Design a protein with these regions (language model features):
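S-adenosylmethionine
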Residues: 1-405
């Protein structure tokens, strides 16, 4: 794998020879595979990860010994777990440290939904999450993942940051996982190497500042901005954090981490604020940068709930979840358990013949007790109501079920 020469020269100088060599060595290793369990569905349900090592900063996270065929696991489609890179689970650790009462949170650049599902599972009960994605196609993928995750207190929107600024909605916590040059993903996604350039780095840090500027107006006094990228360079990381602090008179907050997690701090000599950098070969993860920034309280207290009520949610493009598909653990109506071959057939959109004593009408079909979706039983057969855009498209079906959990 050939890394861009300009990237190598800059990053070696930034990290130092020893750290950079560990990073280079990581390319000869298999990238770790990790999942995060859904506490709404798994806790107390007897599901566990066989042979998986815990992700130390996320109690629901596990490293897997090898990468299974996730597509062919009905429990993935049921929202029992989410396949997520381990470093990205760090957002749950941040939220659990700083958020202890119900809040309204915005994930501004949320697709495909990993950090949103981690956030909604980590926030105190009674919280609300706005999960937003500007790109329409990616927003539909986000909607699918949020729906399957099964938390009712999540609103999916398809808007640009400037639309949120115009809405006058206010949030206690805003996650800005901003578009970036992707240097931290080089090992996992070789295509990102070909997309990298110094010019793209320049475009990214400027775009990131525009996004943060829009987000900042939506943040309540005393609220938290979680700024993250999946890149290494300081222009998109430390230098942007310093700009945020100077531009908005903000302060950086520390996050409790353990030495054995091998998370790296600031790489900018004249910048000592607490930031958290995950480097492949050092940390058991791909690349990530995280910083927690607090908007200083105003001399005049702001009332968040009044701000939410006074905002213009109607001006946002909200995407409605499919009301026929409930992924909540507590549900009403008849249910039919499916075998593994039946579950795969259902997820492929095929019609099924249900047991003779199945009531006519809408029926929830489940796998190992977890709902996959709905069918309409008309007696001679059951019509498949699983959304077409969610269906498994591969024709290969394994002979036996290889469970992840």
């Amino acid at each position: 794998m050939q890394l861009p020469e300009e990237f190598v020269n800059y990053t070696r100088k930034l990290m130092g020879n020893e750290l950079f060599q560990h990073y280079l060595d990581s390319f000869s290793e298999e990238a770790p595979v990790s999942i995060r369990l859904n506490p709404l569905k798994v806790e107390g349900g007897g599901l566990k990860v066989e042979g998986g090592d815990p992700v130390p900063w996320c109690p629901e996270g596990y490293y897997l010994p090898k990468r299974p065929n996730f597509t062919m696991d009905p429990l993935l489609h049921a929202g029992c777990y989410y396949v997520q890179e381990a470093a990205s689970m760090f957002v749950s650790h941040v939220l659990r440290q700083y958020v202890h009462t119900p809040v309204v949170m915005l994930d501004l650049c949320a697709a495909p939904g990993g950090k949103s599902t981690a956030a909604i599972a980590s926030l105190p009960q009674g919280s609300t999450l706005y999960s937003n994605e500007p790109n329409r196609n990616r927003a539909n993928i986000l909607l699918e993942n949020i729906t399957k995750w099964g938390y009712p207190n999540c609103i999916v929107t398809n808007n640009y940051p400037k639309d949120y600024r115009a809405s006058k909605l206010r949030f206690d916590v805003i996650l800005c996982d901003v578009p970036c040059s992707g240097e931290g993903m080089f090992r996992r996604d070789e295509a990102t190497i070909g997309e990298w350039s110094k010019q793209n780095v320049e475009r990214c840090w400027q775009l990131q500042r525009d996004i943060v500027s829009d987000a900042w107006t939506c943040l309540c006094d005393g609220g938290l901005l979680i700024y993250s990228t999946c890149t290494f360079n300081t222009k998109e990381n430390e230098e942007n954090v310093r700009w945020i602090c100077e531009e908005f008179d903000a302060e950086v907050l520390p996050v409790d981490v353990r030495p054995e997690w091998n998370i790296t701090g600031s790489l900018l000599p004249d910048f000592s604020a607490p930031v958290y950098r995950f480097i492949p070969g050092i940390t058991r993860s791909e690349g990530l940068f995280v910083c927690v920034i607090r908007k200083k309280p105003s001399p005049t207290p702001s009332l968040l709930r009044e701000g939410i009520k006074g905002g213009k949610r109607s001006c946002l493009k909200e995407i409605q979840m499919n009301q026929q598909h409930s992924y909540l653990p507590h549900r009403e109506g008849p249910e039919v358990g499916l075998s593994y071959p039946q579950a795969i057939a259902y997820l492929r959109g095929e019609a099924l013949t249900l047991p003779a004593d199945t009531p006519r009408g809408i029926v929830t079909v489940t796998f190992q007790g977890h709902p996959l979706g709905m069918m309409k039983n008309i007696g001679t057969r059951a019509n498949n109501l699983y959304p077409k855009e969610w269906r498994i498209r591969t024709t290969h079906v394994p002979h036996e079920y290889q469970s992840v959990l």
